[in-house]
């Protein structure tokens, strides 16, 4: 909020002389929150460029530096993280950590210094990671295995499932050949294929008999067999490897060790490539582009699965463009060039269908499990239940994303402003706020928007559509927020309470109007001429005279 009392420029102290120096004056003090050295933007039809003044906190732009200064005071008052040295406020902890090193370090060469313990770091990312160690001591729940601390018992249970090796009684399926145990039946079935392959190799060797003397074959086994080719053997299951790093990575299957930890969300992995692939979720990196449509993917298997869609469409197009007249030869040849009779060759139209189709909507899927997941949309089945609130979900990924609402986890961070999100889709939508492009254009008036839902809501102004109907009185609204606000009339809900008295309101605008009654006369003071106003809006209107 704006300053409640008129103290004048001199009452601010000599520490902030740059607040009252105009754009033409130079100041050695670095700007805190103000950026009046904005880019010059030429107005269409005007000869001289106009400077753009941008707020460093919310990126809003203002035509004059006075309006920017007034806005910055209100913007900083709403920020949750205050600096205890100079009372400046910040929205995100990394920005506060960057600011604190100005107070903590008198010598710039020391780098980034922790204000709690005095440790210095070369980069601010290392300082932010170090600050987490101080906050970790306040977490009440401790892991009995690795002493890692958590805020909630649910986070500890999820952590124990990752870091604790499974107990012997949790592996009831035992292989009869080597004695290795497994937690699931399908894992044992996959493992038994190793012994089947070994038995087939032995039977083939006995049937072929000893190799003739002479020059050994390229594929002839060396003396000692696997002991020479694969000298590194696992002491738990007897599996052999050619290289020692492969054996070390394999041992983690038995020990449950996960040494590679994600610095963003704390999830651990057995191999570094798994961690590298996982970190792309936080960074948003998608290094695998499709050469057909340009769509990008985070993992290579996803790209390979996507490319099959284009291949199937090409096959369907070829089958539709060709007719049976030139696919069938007049006189079938006895032996084509490839050595296969033409009668045994199948055209793309005759190829067996390997897709699984939905009986309700006709949509096809490559795998049956994808079809089962899709059919839950028609049946309404929601087998995954949240243990905290009992809400049901049709997909496990939706349950995992929902659980972050209870745990408070926000693993997806914006590189521009540091704001964190619980879902990657929310981060992708937020990134458009930083981008200058507005790809969604209204065909009626030409107004552009960054997000498609904003365009859909705007178009209802032209069409007059009101899809949101109140179930109590039947009144219709074009925006869902208007319906939510209207329903408080029927429910009697008043979520906006005045902090100065006991009154509460159903609309936020009514609360803002009411709070002006608590403000004393002359509470809002102009920093340029000293004139006072009872209303903040009147002060802003007055400031436009100075900007002009």
Swiss-Prot record:
Major localization class: nucleus
Subcellular location per the Swiss-Prot or TrEMBL entry: Nucleus; Cytoplasm, Cytosol
Region (Disordered): 1-47
GO MF annotations, alphabetized: chromatin insulator sequence binding; sequence-specific DNA binding; zinc ion binding
SUPFAM superfamilies noted in UniProt: beta-beta-alpha zinc fingers (SSF57667)
Biased composition (Polar residues): 22-31
Entry comment describing in which tissues the protein is expressed: Expressed in the liver and in subcutaneous and visceral adipose tissue.
Gene name of the record: Repin1
GO biological process, any: positive regulation of D-glucose import
Species annotation: Rattus norvegicus (Rat)
High-level lineage: Eukaryota, Metazoa, Chordata, Craniata, Vertebrata
InterPro entries, per the entry: Znf_C2H2_sf (IPR036236), Znf_C2H2_type (IPR013087)
Signal peptide (UniProt feature, chain positions): none
Zinc finger (C2H2-type): 53-75, 81-103, 112-134, 141-163, 173-195, 232-254, 260-282, 288-310, 356-378, 384-406, 412-434, 440-462, 468-490, 496-518, 524-546
Protein name (record): DNA-binding protein REPIN1
Family annotation (PANTHER family): C2H2-TYPE DOMAIN-CONTAINING PROTEIN, ZINC FINGER PROTEIN
Pfam families assigned: zf-C2H2
Modified positions (Phosphoserine) in chain numbering: 27
Role according to the record: Sequence-specific double-stranded DNA-binding protein. Binds ATT-rich and T-rich DNA sequences and facilitates DNA bending. May regulate the expression of genes involved in cellular fatty acid import, including SCARB1/CD36, and genes involved in lipid droplet formation. May regulate the expression of LCN2, and thereby influence iron metabolism and apoptosis-related pathways. May regulate the expression of genes involved in glucose transport.
GO cellular component, one term: chromosome
Keywords: Acetylation, Cytoplasm, DNA-binding, Metal-binding, Nucleus, Phosphoprotein, Repeat, Zinc, Zinc-finger
Residue pairs linked by disulfide bridges in the UniProt entry: none
Record PTM N6-acetyllysine, positions in chain: 39, 272
């Amino acid at each position: 909020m704006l300053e409640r009392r008129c103290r004048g420029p001199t009452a601010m102290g000599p520490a902030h002389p740059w607040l009252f120096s105009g754009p033409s004056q130079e100041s050695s003090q670095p700007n805190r929150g103000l950026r009046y050295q904005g880019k010059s933007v030429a107005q269409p039809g005007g000869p001289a460029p106009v400077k753009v003044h941008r707020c460093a906190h919310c990126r809003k732009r203002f035509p004059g530096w006075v309006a920017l200064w007034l806005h910055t005071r209100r913007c900083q008052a709403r920020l949750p993280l205050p600096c205890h040295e100079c009372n400046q406020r910040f929205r995100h902890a990394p920005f506060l950590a960057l600011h604190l090193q100005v107070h903590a370090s008198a010598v710039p060469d020391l780098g980034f210094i922790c204000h709690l313990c005095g440790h210095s770091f070369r980069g601010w990312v290392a300082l932010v990671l170090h600050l987490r160690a101080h906050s970790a001591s306040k977490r009440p729940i401790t892991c009995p295995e690795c002493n890692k601390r958590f805020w909630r018992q649910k986070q500890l249970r999820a952590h124990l499932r990752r870091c604790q090796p499974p107990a012997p009684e949790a592996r009831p399926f035992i292989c009869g050949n080597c004695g290795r145990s497994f937690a699931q039946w399908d894992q044992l079935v996959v493992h038994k294929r190793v012994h089947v392959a070994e038995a087939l190799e032995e039977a083939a060797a006995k049937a072929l008999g000893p190799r003739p003397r002479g020059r050994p074959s390229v594929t002839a086994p060396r003396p000692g067999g696997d002991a020479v080719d694969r000298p590194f053997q696992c002491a738990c299951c007897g599996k052999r490897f050619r290289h020692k790093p492969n054996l070390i990575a394999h041992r983690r299957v038995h020990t449950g060790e996960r040494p590679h930890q994600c610095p963003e969300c704390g999830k651990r992995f057995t191999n570094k490539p798994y961690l590298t692939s996982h970190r792309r979720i936080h960074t948003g990196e998608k290094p695998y582009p499709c050469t057909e449509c340009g769509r990008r993917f985070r993992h290579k298997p996803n790209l390979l699965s996507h490319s099959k869609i284009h291949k199937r469409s090409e096959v369907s197009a070829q089958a539709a463009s060709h007719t049976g007249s030139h696919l069938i030869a007049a006189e079938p040849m006895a032996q084509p060039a490839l050595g296969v009779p033409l009668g045994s060759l199948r055209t793309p139209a005759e190829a067996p269908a390997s897709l699984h189709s939905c009986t309700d909507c006709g949509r096809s899927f490559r795998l049956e499990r994808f079809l089962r997941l899709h059919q839950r949309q028609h049946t309404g089945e929601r087998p995954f239940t949240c243990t905290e609130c009992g809400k049901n979900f049709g997909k496990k990924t939706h349950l995992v994303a929902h659980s972050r609402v209870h745990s408070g986890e926000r693993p997806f961070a914006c590189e521009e402003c540091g704001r964190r999100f619980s879902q990657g889709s929310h981060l992708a939508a937020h990134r458009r706020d930083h981008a200058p492009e507005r790809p969604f254009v209204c065909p009626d008036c030409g107004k552009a928007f960054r997000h498609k839902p904003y365009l859909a809501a705007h178009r209802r102004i032209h069409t007059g559509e009101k899809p949101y109907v109140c179930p109590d009185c039947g009144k219709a609204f074009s925006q869902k927020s208007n319906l939510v606000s209207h329903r408080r009339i029927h429910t009697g809900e008043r979520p906006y309470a005045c902090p100065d008295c006991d009154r509460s309101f159903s609309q936020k605008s009514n609360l803002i109007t009411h709070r002006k009654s608590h403000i004393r006369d002359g509470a809002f003071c102009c920093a340029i001429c000293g004139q006072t106003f009872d209303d903040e809006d009147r002060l802003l209107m007055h400031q436009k005279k100075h900007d002009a």
